Protein backbone atom coordinates (compact mmCIF):
# COMPACT_ATOMS: atom_id res chain seq x y z
CA UNK A 1 0.00 0.00 0.00
CA UNK A 2 1.03 3.63 -0.36
CA UNK A 3 2.97 5.00 2.58
CA UNK A 4 3.78 8.52 3.74
CA UNK A 5 6.77 7.45 5.82
CA UNK A 6 9.64 8.26 3.39
CA UNK A 7 8.11 11.61 2.41
CA UNK A 8 7.55 12.78 5.98
CA UNK A 9 10.97 11.55 7.14
CA UNK A 10 12.67 13.52 4.36
CA UNK A 11 10.66 16.67 5.12
CA UNK A 12 11.40 16.64 8.83
CA UNK A 13 15.09 15.84 8.29
CA UNK A 14 15.81 18.35 5.52
CA UNK A 15 13.92 21.26 7.02
CA UNK A 16 14.36 20.49 10.72
CA UNK A 17 10.66 20.92 11.34
CA UNK A 18 8.97 19.69 14.47
CA UNK A 19 5.52 18.21 14.64
CA UNK A 20 3.66 18.27 11.33
CA UNK A 21 0.05 17.65 10.37
CA UNK A 22 -0.06 15.34 7.38
CA UNK A 23 -2.88 16.06 4.92
CA UNK A 24 -3.85 13.28 2.54
CA UNK A 25 -6.75 11.86 0.57
CA UNK A 26 -8.46 8.53 1.20
CA UNK A 27 -5.90 6.61 -0.86
CA UNK A 28 -3.31 7.25 1.85
CA UNK A 29 -5.72 6.78 4.76
CA UNK A 30 -4.30 3.45 5.89
CA UNK A 31 -3.69 1.99 9.32
CA UNK A 32 0.02 1.84 8.54
CA UNK A 33 0.26 5.56 7.81
CA UNK A 34 -1.86 6.59 10.78
CA UNK A 35 -0.03 4.40 13.30
CA UNK A 36 3.34 5.66 12.06
CA UNK A 37 2.39 9.34 12.22
CA UNK A 38 1.02 8.99 15.74
CA UNK A 39 4.09 7.04 16.85
CA UNK A 40 6.45 9.88 15.89
CA UNK A 41 4.20 12.57 17.31
CA UNK A 42 2.72 13.92 14.10
CA UNK A 43 -0.91 14.66 13.38
CA UNK A 44 -3.06 13.97 10.35
CA UNK A 45 -6.08 15.20 8.44
CA UNK A 46 -7.31 12.64 5.90
CA UNK A 47 -10.42 12.00 3.89
CA UNK A 48 -12.31 8.76 4.45
CA UNK A 49 -14.42 6.88 1.93
CA UNK A 50 -18.02 6.93 3.14
CA UNK A 51 -19.25 4.51 0.49
CA UNK A 52 -16.60 2.01 1.58
CA UNK A 53 -17.19 2.55 5.30
CA UNK A 54 -19.14 0.38 7.71
CA UNK A 55 -22.88 0.79 8.19
CA UNK A 56 -22.46 2.59 11.52
CA UNK A 57 -20.64 5.49 9.88
CA UNK A 58 -23.12 5.61 7.00
CA UNK A 59 -25.98 5.80 9.50
CA UNK A 60 -24.22 8.66 11.33
CA UNK A 61 -23.71 10.52 8.06
CA UNK A 62 -27.36 10.19 7.01
CA UNK A 63 -28.78 11.02 10.45
CA UNK A 64 -29.83 14.69 10.39
CA UNK A 65 -29.13 15.13 14.11
CA UNK A 66 -26.26 17.52 14.78
CA UNK A 67 -25.88 19.09 11.36
CA UNK A 68 -25.31 22.84 11.13
CA UNK A 69 -26.58 24.41 7.89
CA UNK A 70 -25.57 27.57 6.11
CA UNK A 71 -28.21 30.23 5.46
CA UNK A 72 -29.39 28.94 2.07
CA UNK A 73 -29.29 25.26 3.08
CA UNK A 74 -26.73 24.33 0.41
CA UNK A 75 -24.09 23.20 2.89
CA UNK A 76 -24.04 21.46 6.25
CA UNK A 77 -21.50 19.95 8.61
CA UNK A 78 -21.20 18.07 11.89
CA UNK A 79 -18.60 16.10 13.80
CA UNK A 80 -17.98 13.68 16.63
CA UNK A 81 -15.10 12.23 18.60
CA UNK A 82 -14.99 8.55 17.77
CA UNK A 83 -12.55 5.65 18.26
CA UNK A 84 -11.75 3.85 15.00
CA UNK A 85 -10.13 0.44 14.65
CA UNK A 86 -7.38 0.34 12.03
CA UNK A 87 -5.27 -2.50 10.69
CA UNK A 88 -1.53 -2.31 10.13
CA UNK A 89 1.53 -4.54 9.88
CA UNK A 90 4.14 -4.62 12.63
CA UNK A 91 7.43 -6.48 12.82
CA UNK A 92 7.75 -9.28 15.38
CA UNK A 93 11.03 -11.19 15.54
CA UNK A 94 11.92 -9.86 12.13
CA UNK A 95 8.67 -11.01 10.54
CA UNK A 96 5.65 -8.94 9.42
CA UNK A 97 2.56 -9.58 11.53
CA UNK A 98 -0.92 -8.19 10.95
CA UNK A 99 -2.23 -6.20 13.90
CA UNK A 100 -5.12 -3.96 14.90
CA UNK A 101 -5.27 -0.92 17.12
CA UNK A 102 -7.82 1.72 18.04
CA UNK A 103 -7.13 5.38 17.33
CA UNK A 104 -9.09 8.23 18.87
CA UNK A 105 -10.15 10.62 16.12
CA UNK A 106 -12.42 13.48 15.29
CA UNK A 107 -14.69 12.68 12.35
CA UNK A 108 -15.92 15.70 10.40
CA UNK A 109 -18.79 15.17 7.97
CA UNK A 110 -19.91 17.78 5.49
CA UNK A 111 -22.39 17.92 2.62
CA UNK A 112 -22.50 20.29 -0.33
CA UNK A 113 -25.37 20.71 -2.78
CA UNK A 114 -22.86 21.43 -5.55
CA UNK A 115 -20.95 18.22 -4.80
CA UNK A 116 -24.23 16.29 -4.78
CA UNK A 117 -25.18 17.62 -8.22
CA UNK A 118 -21.73 16.74 -9.57
CA UNK A 119 -21.91 13.18 -8.20
CA UNK A 120 -25.38 12.68 -9.67
CA UNK A 121 -24.26 13.94 -13.10
CA UNK A 122 -21.18 11.72 -13.11
CA UNK A 123 -23.20 8.66 -12.13
CA UNK A 124 -25.82 9.40 -14.78
CA UNK A 125 -23.17 9.01 -17.48
CA UNK A 126 -22.38 5.54 -16.13
CA UNK A 127 -26.08 4.66 -15.88
CA UNK A 128 -26.65 5.69 -19.50
CA UNK A 129 -23.77 3.46 -20.50
CA UNK A 130 -25.19 0.61 -18.39
CA UNK A 131 -28.53 0.92 -20.19
CA UNK A 132 -26.76 0.79 -23.54
CA UNK A 133 -24.82 -2.27 -22.39
CA UNK A 134 -28.04 -4.07 -21.50
CA UNK A 135 -29.42 -3.43 -24.96
CA UNK A 136 -26.19 -3.95 -26.89
CA UNK A 137 -24.18 -6.59 -25.04
CA UNK A 138 -21.92 -7.43 -27.98
CA UNK A 139 -20.49 -3.89 -28.00
CA UNK A 140 -18.95 -4.31 -24.57
CA UNK A 141 -16.34 -6.22 -22.59
CA UNK A 142 -14.93 -5.83 -19.10
CA UNK A 143 -12.51 -3.13 -20.20
CA UNK A 144 -14.80 -0.80 -22.10
CA UNK A 145 -17.74 -0.95 -19.70
CA UNK A 146 -15.71 0.08 -16.65
CA UNK A 147 -17.79 2.25 -14.32
CA UNK A 148 -21.06 1.06 -15.80
CA UNK A 149 -20.91 -2.67 -15.12
CA UNK A 150 -21.60 -2.27 -11.40
CA UNK A 151 -25.08 -0.99 -12.25
CA UNK A 152 -26.01 -4.08 -14.28
CA UNK A 153 -27.48 -7.11 -12.50
CA UNK A 154 -26.52 -10.66 -13.54
CA UNK A 155 -23.50 -9.46 -15.54
CA UNK A 156 -20.71 -12.06 -15.76
CA UNK A 157 -17.32 -11.74 -17.46
CA UNK A 158 -15.01 -14.42 -18.79
CA UNK A 159 -12.03 -14.41 -16.42
CA UNK A 160 -9.55 -14.97 -19.23
CA UNK A 161 -10.85 -12.84 -22.09
CA UNK A 162 -12.96 -10.23 -20.31
CA UNK A 163 -15.82 -10.92 -22.69
CA UNK A 164 -19.37 -10.87 -21.36
CA UNK A 165 -20.72 -14.36 -20.77
CA UNK A 166 -24.33 -14.99 -21.68
CA UNK A 167 -26.16 -14.69 -18.39
CA UNK A 168 -28.62 -17.26 -17.07
CA UNK A 169 -30.87 -14.38 -16.02
CA UNK A 170 -31.76 -11.36 -18.13
CA UNK A 171 -29.56 -8.31 -17.61
CA UNK A 172 -31.25 -5.43 -15.84
CA UNK A 173 -30.42 -2.12 -14.23
CA UNK A 174 -29.65 -2.38 -10.51
CA UNK A 175 -32.09 0.25 -9.28
CA UNK A 176 -31.48 -0.62 -5.61
CA UNK A 177 -27.75 0.03 -5.93
CA UNK A 178 -28.39 3.34 -7.66
CA UNK A 179 -30.81 4.41 -4.92
CA UNK A 180 -28.30 3.49 -2.20
CA UNK A 181 -25.55 5.49 -3.88
CA UNK A 182 -27.82 8.52 -4.30
CA UNK A 183 -28.31 8.74 -0.55
CA UNK A 184 -24.62 9.56 -0.07
CA UNK A 185 -24.25 12.06 -2.91
CA UNK A 186 -22.49 15.23 -1.78
CA UNK A 187 -21.22 13.88 1.54
CA UNK A 188 -17.55 13.88 2.53
CA UNK A 189 -15.83 12.56 5.63
CA UNK A 190 -12.56 13.72 7.14
CA UNK A 191 -10.80 12.00 10.04
CA UNK A 192 -8.18 13.77 12.11
CA UNK A 193 -5.99 13.52 15.16
CA UNK A 194 -6.53 17.25 15.79
CA UNK A 195 -9.54 16.91 18.04
CA UNK A 196 -9.35 20.42 19.53
CA UNK A 197 -9.66 22.19 16.20
CA UNK A 198 -13.07 23.30 14.98
CA UNK A 199 -14.88 21.59 12.13
CA UNK A 200 -14.26 24.59 9.86
CA UNK A 201 -10.55 24.60 10.70
CA UNK A 202 -10.26 20.91 9.84
CA UNK A 203 -12.08 21.36 6.53
CA UNK A 204 -9.88 24.36 5.65
CA UNK A 205 -6.73 22.38 6.46
CA UNK A 206 -7.88 19.53 4.23
CA UNK A 207 -8.77 21.83 1.35
CA UNK A 208 -5.43 23.63 1.70
Task: Describe the residue ranges of each PLM region.
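Anion-binding and metal-coordination hotspots
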Residues: 1-208
